[in-house]
């Protein structure tokens, strides 16, 4: 039975954890899998409950963190080398940047025959300055040469990585979309809506816009907050903005909201315009309480929040970046705005707020669209097929 060593940066809320967890739990019994994870930052919400609920028992690399630290990174490398020597995997599959760097080097130097890496996003624009971005790009090109295959999670991401950024030749890439348990978003909508709105002091007639994600620069919450303030001044409807998540920019975003004369709260919307809820782990219970899900990022891979919003049949407004056009049905489940264009974003948000029939139309196709493409059963089937194919190619080469 082929052995798969799966290495993930850290167990924080987001697509990579779900991807690694579902693959580790549900991939074909033809493979034996060991899940290894680094450590999350203190400011991040843990997603360890996801692997715990699936009955997984990952091994933790205590020195592997998101931030670059040569001493800790070298120690993490040595820990991974030891695990590889003990487990003797046929396949090492890494997820996200830090795990991809340390894990692929360790696997290559230990002679692991099949090495894969999944890009859950990339940092080749909108994250760093030109020099730092160039360094990271050259590192990824070097690591790609050590890899058997590179997995992209959308066709747009593949095009960016192989054609625009030339990380590796296009034939080295395979597209395997993310996978989730999406049926849980279809349960008890009316009850969940009432409970969420009662918890946060929202009236049933309030029109509630929500955004879900880390409060970090790349997510560009400033754009949404400013657009919300502009739309609020133009509509007769009672608007509320729910910001779900946490991170380094929380205090700055609160100050920015104040500067726009918006009233904020961490608990209730009774006398507030904007509520910062921090993280909500049972997001399937929160989404029915929203009327619109927004995303305002400068850059994205395959944002989980938009997949989940469609699974819950919630209309979307988003910037047109990264793999988002692959995820939504523009004009049927979502409206898209050009990157960081406040005028366009505000105009389209106002249209979505004012047009009740448009929002109703956007609730029809969401679940069907994402279930066909992003169920965890499809993810596991597609990845199992890829593993089997690569293992068969390896066996044939060994015989020759």
Question: Language-model segments: which ranges?
Answer:
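A conserved mid-protein helix/loop that constitutes part of the nucleotide-sugar donor-binding site
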Residues: 17-22, 207, 211-232, 241, ...
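A short, well-ordered alpha-helix in the C-terminal region of glycosyltransferases
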Residues: 198, 344, 351, 358-372, ...
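N-terminal strand-loop element at the rim of the active site
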Residues: 6-14, 18-72, 160, 164, ...
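Nucleotide-activated donor-binding/catalytic signature segment of Leloir-type glycosyltransferases, i.e.
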Residues: 254-278
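Short hydrophobic beta-strand element within catalytic cores of glycosyltransferases
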Residues: 315-318, 328
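Conserved acidic donor-binding segment of nucleotide-sugar-dependent glycosyltransferases
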Residues: 330-331, 335-342, 351-357
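A short, active-site helix/loop in glycosyltransferases that binds the activated sugar's phosphate group
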Residues: 146-172, 180-184
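Aromatic "clamp/platform" in nucleotide-sugar-dependent glycosyltransferases that forms part
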Residues: 279, 298
